[in-house]
């Protein structure tokens, strides 16, 4: 019961923390992590568009979610622009602060989900101009994503701010803008003429492969950190869900690109039936990789639940929305696999998971509104714009290091006592 009371005060208590500040002053602490909520909202719209079992009004619900996402994305762009103009120097500080710069890709990912949602929610109700708009937006996004990703990786390598004990799953985010180029292509390919569809299929596969291989490298580094240092503090563990998305989105992208290629152009590559071969290979690869996504989901879920059951202090973070987008990939992958292997059971599982992730999304929205009201977000020292790692996080790692040192000393003493005992036995035996 004590833990329940603690969690209530941390996540649901409506008492205001700290003296009231004007919203204009609080916007100095509006960080890139806020775009994770727009990214997650766009993901919910994408899930809604793929439901296998549909009912009257579901498409209207998807349109409402899409419009809501566009609204908050516009609001966030205005807020981050206001911060950079009103408080000079915060833009350069953002780029140099590893706690904040890792979430900069979420802004591009939020835009990417908006482009992806144009096909199910705008294309059927507009004219030929929407085909051109989708195509132009896609290739502009590809160019911007490539420039941004190279710049961000160079910046991180140049500053090298991380050590093995501060490695976090969010390190995979910098490659996401390139990887999401494949996801966008898979979502919009059927809106394009055959020749343009072929270009998108080729680019989508290439970018998805790039994202997946970089993910494998970062995933190995994270596993090394988990084995040697342990899990993160409880409040940061929802970020582990980020590791779910790359294998899931890779399977989803390959499947949807294959479906689009088959619908638009049977000879997408060389050969009369190359699209059918692509669909077979895509289904095989999606089945091959979905196990990794499910494993990462289960590991993250158990870690989060275990963290919530401890007495560690937990503070809501807007970056928790990243787990919505990550799990959206797994849900959509399951739904499209059900379509590929013609299994209603798999489609039902995917739909149930989609409803579940939508409920979690609503809960996170309520937690966000509450955190803004009580000044646990958009407040000095409470967001990702801090110059250093949070003191409680550093204390957590210091505690782990002290435990490791104590354990090493105990093991050393036991070994010395064992050696001394063996020596005495040998000496007495010789006498």
From Swiss-Prot:
Keyword Membrane included in the entry's annotation: yes
Family classification: Belongs to the tellurite-resistance/dicarboxylate transporter (TDT) family.
Residues annotated as transmembrane: 30-50, 62-82, 101-121, 136-156, 167-187, 201-221, 239-259, 284-304, 318-338, 346-366
Location of this chain's protein in the cell: Membrane
Gene Ontology MF, one: transmembrane transporter activity
UniProt biased composition (Basic and acidic residues): 402-424
Topology in the lipid bilayer: Multi-pass membrane protein
Name of the protein described by the UniProt record: Putative malic acid transport protein
InterPro entries the record matches: Mae1, SLAC1/Mae1/Ssu1/TehA, Voltage-dep_anion_channel_sf
One GO location term (cellular component): membrane
Organism this protein belongs to: Schizosaccharomyces pombe (strain 972 / ATCC 24843)
Keywords, alphabetical: Membrane, Transmembrane, Transmembrane helix
Pfam hit, one: SLAC1
Record-linked Gene3D superfamilies: Voltage-dependent anion channel
Region described as Disordered: 402-431
């Amino acid at each position: 019961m004590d833990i329940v009371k603690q969690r209530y005060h941390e996540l649901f208590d409506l008492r205001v923390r700290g003296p009231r500040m004007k919203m204009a002053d609080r916007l100095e602490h509006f960080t890139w992590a806020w775009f994770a909520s727009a990214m997650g909202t766009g993901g919910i719209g994408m899930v809604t568009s793929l439901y296998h079992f549909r009912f009257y009004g579901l498409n209207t619900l998807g349109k409402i979610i899409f419009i809501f996402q566009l609204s908050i994305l516009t609001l966030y762009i205005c807020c981050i622009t206001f911060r950079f103009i009103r408080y000079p120097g915060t833009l350069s500080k953002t780029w140099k602060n590893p706690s904040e710069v890792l979430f900069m890709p979420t802004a591009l990912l939020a835009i990417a989900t908006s482009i992806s949602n144009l096909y199910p929610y705008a294309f059927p109700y507009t004219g030929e101009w929407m085909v051109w708009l989708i195509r132009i937006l896609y290739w502009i996004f590809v160019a911007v994503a490539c420039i941004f990703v190279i710049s961000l990786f160079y910046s991180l390598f140049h500053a090298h701010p991380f050590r093995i004990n501060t490695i976090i799953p969010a390190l995979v985010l910098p490659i996401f803008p390139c990887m999401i180029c494949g996801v966008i292509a898979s979502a919009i390919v059927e809106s394009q003429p055959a020749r343009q569809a072929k270009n998108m299929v080729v680019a989508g596969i290439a970018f998805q492969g790039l994202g997946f291989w970089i993910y494998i490298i970062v995933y190995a580094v994270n596993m090394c950190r988990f084995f040697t240092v342990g899990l993160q503090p409880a409040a940061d563990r929802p970020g582990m869900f980020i590791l779910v998305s790359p294998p899931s989105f890779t399977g989803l992208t390959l499947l949807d690109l294959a479906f689009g290629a088959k619908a638009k152009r049977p000879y997408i590559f060389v050969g009369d039936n190359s699209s059918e071969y692509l669909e077979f290979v895509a289904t095989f690869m999606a089945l091959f990789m979905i196990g990794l996504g499910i494993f990462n989901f289960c590991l993250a879920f158990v870690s989060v639940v275990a963290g919530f059951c401890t007495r560690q202090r937990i503070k809501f973070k807007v970056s928790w929305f990243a787990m919505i987008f990550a799990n959206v990939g797994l849900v959509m992958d399951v739904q499209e696999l059900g379509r590929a292997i013609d299994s209603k059971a798999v489609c039902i599982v995917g739909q149930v998971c989609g409803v579940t992730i939508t409920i979690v999304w609503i809960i996170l929205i309520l937690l966000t509104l509450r955190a803004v009201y009580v000044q646990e977000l958009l407040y000095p020292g409470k967001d990702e714009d801090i110059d250093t790692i949070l003191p409680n996080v550093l204390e957590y790692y210091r505690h782990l290091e002290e435990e490791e040192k104590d354990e090493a000393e105990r093991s050393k003493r036991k070994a010395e006592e064992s050696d001394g005992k063996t020596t005495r036995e040998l000496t007495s035996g010789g006498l």
